[in-house]
Swiss-Prot record:
The gene is MYB2. InterPro entries: Homeodomain-like_sf, Myb_dom, Plant_SW-associated_TFs, SANT/Myb. Germinating seed and apical meristem of shoot and root. Residues 11-63, 64-118 form the HTH myb-type domain. It comes from the Eukaryota. Possible transcription activator in response to an external signal. May be involved in the regulation of flavonoid biosynthesis. The keyword Zinc does not apply. Residues 137-158 are annotated as: Disordered. PROSITE patterns: HTH_MYB. This is Myb-related protein Hv33. Residues 39-63, 91-114 bind DNA. Keywords: Activator, DNA-binding, Nucleus, Repeat, Transcription, Transcription regulation. It comes from Hordeum vulgare. PANTHER family: MYB DOMAIN PROTEIN 55, MYB-RELATED PROTEIN. GO terms for molecular function: DNA binding.
Length: 302
């Protein structure tokens, strides 16, 4: 029942472990007389209690007549380092370039001797590059922002020191100081004229030698005659000045230079007027201003 083991009754047991000098002599004499044949039949023909794989490795690595014995020379060591830099850990290909040396022998010599020598010289055995340069490359890759910050241009600060120059930021509303005071005054006058034109409902503004001329304010203060305001919380009197405002301002011209006496007169009249008349609407205040004499002279504004 089952498959019989190789160590069955009547069959010699396969030996493992170190080879004895007698076994080396039997294998060597058999290969010299009969040559290399089928390795699975060599143990039976050479009267060895070994497997075919063990006989093959023993012949290739230790018993071949062309194998070199002894330590590696300095020339062989340099050759191994140069080949390892190109081929890496391909030991069989490296051994093909070194007659008389096996791949196992070269691998053991690399791990036990050559690798330690390279590290003592400051060379990485895996990359064959100086360890200092490898550390420098790693540090440079880890700090790209610091190098980018160093490459930024510097500009002088207020105290005389150099600070990094800030990038230019787009300003949708640039200042007009670079264009001179005249440009700013013209721009202010143009904006005032445009704003007044919008208040007048799109009507054109008359422009004379002084800058502003007579204008029709009836479009701004056009109040219906039938418009009445309700009673306030403190007085029940009914105000109805809409028609009077339109008739008073018809043909009048404002004089901005003499506005201060007008305001003073308006305050004086309000102080002597009854208490129920002190609360006034914006259109009613304009009607008081329109009753004064305005001329067309304008004083320069700075």
């Amino acid at each position: 029942m089952g498959r019989p083991s190789s160590g069955a009754v009547g069959q010699p047991k396969v030996r493992k472990g170190l080879w004895s000098p007698e076994e080396d002599e039997k294998l060597y004499n058999h290969i010299i007389r009969h040559g290399v044949g089928c390795w699975s039949s060599v143990p039976r023909l050479a009267a060895l209690n070994r497997c075919g794989k063990s006989c093959r490795l023993r012949w290739i690595n230790y018993l071949r007549p062309d194998l070199k014995r002894g330590c590696f020379s300095q020339q062989e060591e340099d050759h191994i380092v140069a080949l390892h830099q190109i081929l890496g850990n391909r030991w069989s290909q490296i051994a093909s370039h070194l007659p008389g040396r096996t791949d196992n022998e070269i691998k053991n010599f690399w791990n036990s001797c050559i690798k330690k020598k390279l590290r003592q010289q400051g060379i990485d055995p895996a990359t064959h590059k100086p360890m200092a340069s490898a550390d420098t490359a790693t540090a440079a890759a880890a700090l790209p922002d610091a190098e980018e910050e160093d490459r930024k241009p510097l500009c002088p600060a207020v105290d005389g020191s150099l600070v990094p120059k800030q990038p230019a930021v787009f300003d949708p509303f640039p200042l007009c100081v670079d264009y001179g005071a005249g440009f700013a005054e013209e721009l202010g006058a143009a904006n005032a004229a445009a704003l007044y034109g919008q208040l007048c409902g799109g009507k054109e503004v008359a422009d004379d030698d002084a800058g502003f001329g007579a204008a029709d304010y009836s479009c701004v203060l056009d109040v219906s005659e039938n418009l009445g305001y309700g009673e306030s919380s403190s007085n029940s009197s009914n105000w109805n000045y809409g028609g009077e405002v339109g008739s008073v301002l018809d043909g009048e011209v404002p004089h901005w230079a003499k506005a201060e006496p007008a305001f003073a007169e308006m305050e004086r009249q309000q102080q002597h007027s009854p208490a129920e008349q002190k609360l006034s609407l914006p259109c009613q205040e304009q009607s008081l201003l329109a009753s004064f004499d305005f001329n067309l002279e304008l004083e320069p504004y700075f």
